[in-house]
Amino acid sequence: MHDKSSSLILRTAELLIFALWIVALVAQSLSAADKIRVGFSAISLANAPVWIAEEKGFFKKYDIETEAIVIGGGATRSLSAVIAGDLQFGSTGGGAVVSAVFSGSDIAMVAAGNNKGIQRLMVKADVATPAALKGKRIGITTLGSSGHLALLLMLRKWNMAPEEVQIIQVGASPVMFISLQKGGIDAAVLQDPTFFMAEDTGFKTLGDPVAMDIQYLQNVLVASRGYVKTHRDLASRFMKGFVEGVAHFKRNKEDSLKILMKKMRIEKGKETYLERSYGLYATQYMEAAPYPSATGTKTVLEFMAKEFPKAKTADPNQFIDNSLIKPLEDSGFIRTLYQ
């Protein structure tokens, strides 16, 4: 009787140890599979959906552990990290994606933080029309930047050639603003919140890509097609958390600002410009179903045709993968977030 009892206890212990071992293996497997690293090229409000989804537990709700990293170094750096496999998702500009695909990468735009532009062309109050810019010095950050593209698109909309103005590389928006104030340049392509500062000191907006309905993929979320294909379930769950982050951002101003102040290290009492920028992102820039714009992609292709001749005939959709967002819209998932 004693031997049978001992044998039963031993057998039970063995089964328990085996069960615990299986649970540990499964937990370890899930933990490894469910980690996602997201990279940003800069500290920006365009990062809000990911930051908010992290802080509010939206990713955790879908069994995902995220690590959001600000890499810096411009749009190409975060894109390179995605291509190398160091990041699963990255935030970058549409032009960088087009260049990468033409260079042989299997990268694709899977969502958009902002299909239009965060820049505005700021001028002195006495500049009444675009024609008054002829021969004037217009400041941009660098040639080939999103601000440069925004300027070229605005000039095209006004039926003006780039040669009709002087395009000058000045540096970041704050530096351009100082140059504008001192008369070093006559106009400047500034981004938020610097164009608010310019408005507050007497300058005015002559060109606004949003008001002019100009799309050029200011900020997009990318992933490799290979990763999306082999990690379909995980990528889909990530996108659920992402669109919940978008919805919370658009619908909950106070809470969103609190999170953004923390992430962007803005001291309390100094959030005036952040709040004004929030208004633009919540109502004009971010969309409930954040599809990358085919129209914006076409625009980018038109301007890259000199560098890549095949851009003239390229299909904009070859740079886009809507397979993560479309099921969420078609199923009504996104709609329920706004009810």
Describe each PLM feature range:
Residues 34-182, 186-192, 205-209, 214-215:
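Short, glycine-/small- and polar/acidic-enriched structural segments
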Residues 1-11:
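N-terminal secretory signal peptides that target proteins for export/translocation
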Residues 174-266:
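Pocket-lining segment of extracytoplasmic ligand-binding domains
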Residues 229-312:
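Secondary-structure end/capping motifs
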Residues 301-339:
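Conserved C-terminal helix/tail region of periplasmic/extracytoplasmic solute-binding proteins
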Residues 13-27:
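Bacterial N-terminal signal peptides
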